[in-house]
Amino acid sequence: MIYGANASGKSNIVKALQTMKTIVISSAKKQRGDKLPITPFLLGNEDNKPTKFEIIFIQNDTKYQYGFILNSEKILEEWLLIFGESNRAQKWFERIYNEKEEKYNYSFGTKFLGSKQLWAENTRDNALFLSVAIQLNNEQLKPVFDFF
């Protein structure tokens, strides 16, 4: 439930969550070169300025912090943190685009298991690592994907 005064941004929050959901669910299905569904700020003059999405949520009694930064062409950053019983953040994965090298740098936490290299190698510029790993049968990320 979202409460707030008129013109306080409630509709924009819903639209942002819908856009985030669309990107998470559909990015692995995009073809190389397909644009990502980002609408730049209508009054701005920077069409390809990066947009950040981040959400903290609880799924199956576990707290997650997931987010990504993108423009219309590629995912620039992506991360997932899990909060254990001590409520301390554990990094499961982080992906950052290195413009100088024109490649992604990945880092993985020790609690994140599976074929990390395979998933990373199959993640295109315009796809989320989360979405690709799910397409390639990662069970550990299923609660995060299912949230959307």
Predicted regions: what is each one?
Residues 65-148:
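Electropositive, glycine-dotted interaction segments
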Residues 1, 5, 11-66, 71-75:
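Conserved P-loop NTP-binding catalytic core
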